[in-house]
Amino acid sequence: VIKVAIIIGSTRPGRNGEAVARWVHDLALKRDDAEFELVDLKDFDLPHLDEVMPAAMGRYSHPHTRAWAAKIASFDAYVFVTPEYNHSTSGALKNAIDFLYAEWNNKAAGFVSYGSNGGTRAVEHLRLVMGELQVADVRAQVALSLFTDFENFSVLNPSAEQEDAATAMLDQVVAWGQALCPLRT
């Protein structure tokens, strides 16, 4: 059974990301084809990237980087829950991704985004980043609109169609995560 991280990609006070990630996690827990774990960037307290050596070298000098690397390396696939800020992902998520390299390689990723336009532009940016990290990103995604999937822009209330989209995305993430296992052995 593969392990999938559901990564909360915002550290902002009052963030919607935690509720979105918990919704995805609750859906995922109904499955028996993978283990799912919530991973909150706030729990790692990563500063702005402060490693002297490039991540591709894998020589991490700080305890916070080593802890983050160990956590990320323990998974076979990822679901990134991201807000859209100014047509991109959050700075906190991009920073956390940039701390590491090999820990991401040859794994699968799916995306759940939210924002005034569903957060799709944040996902497009993340897809480019994933390619550089040798991560296979799946086609199915969830794009939650602050106008239709939230009440008062802050209380998550997704439609049944969004649940179907999440199921499709999880199906693909698990399938690709399993398929890529031989590349990681």
Regions found by a protein language model. Name each.
Residues 1-82, 87-94, 99, 153-185:
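N-terminal beta1-alpha1-beta2 submodule of the flavodoxin-like/Rossmannoid cofactor-binding fold
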Residues 45, 49, 100, 134, ...:
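Glycine-rich, flexible loop/turn motifs
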Residues 105-147, 160-165:
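Short, glycine-/small-residue-rich phosphate/pyrophosphate-handling segment
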